[in-house]
Amino acid sequence: MAADQISVRPARAADRRSLAVLFAEVAQERDGIAAEPPIDVDGLAEHWRLDGTLVAVADGDLVGEIRVDPSWMGFGEIGMMVAASWRGRGVGSALVAAAIEWARGQGLHKLALQVFPHNKAAIALYRKFGFVEEGRLAAHVRRADGQLWDLIEMGLLL
């Protein structure tokens, strides 16, 4: 499926369960997001915040999500996840483009994010949209096995 067959729209209450399942699937990979299994899908679905959340839909399935958390300081912090089977197929690009448009519409002046240094595909995607590395948080995330992982901070002035 081409990127033009992927639709991005604001998340709805009916998406909460699919979002929680996607989150659990991405967490199971143990390398893209800080959360690790087990994930309480039912509890997560019940409390999933929809404000600023955009979802990517293909063939009627939710295949990705990006959320912009606006700060009182005028910037937005973003977090994104894409189903493994949909990576490299334009979902991430569609989500980032939509988030940038949404943030501009909200009057935000900047988007910021954190990404693991080993997540080269995500870093390349963000750079494609103009995000630049602004710093590194050393040993910032403690994994369940005791490993300490760095985070790269990236930002985009809108």
Regions found by a protein language model. Name each.
Residues 2, 149-158:
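Terminal substrate-recognition subdomain of acyl/acetyltransferases
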Residues 7-19:
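A short beta-loop-alpha structural element at the N-terminal edge
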Residues 10-13, 24-85, 96-97, 102, ...:
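Acetyl-CoA-dependent GNAT
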Residues 18, 77, 81, 121:
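Amphipathic alpha-helical recognition patches that constitute DNA-binding helices
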Residues 110-115, 127, 132-148:
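Conserved catalytic-core motifs of GNAT/GCN5-like acyltransferases
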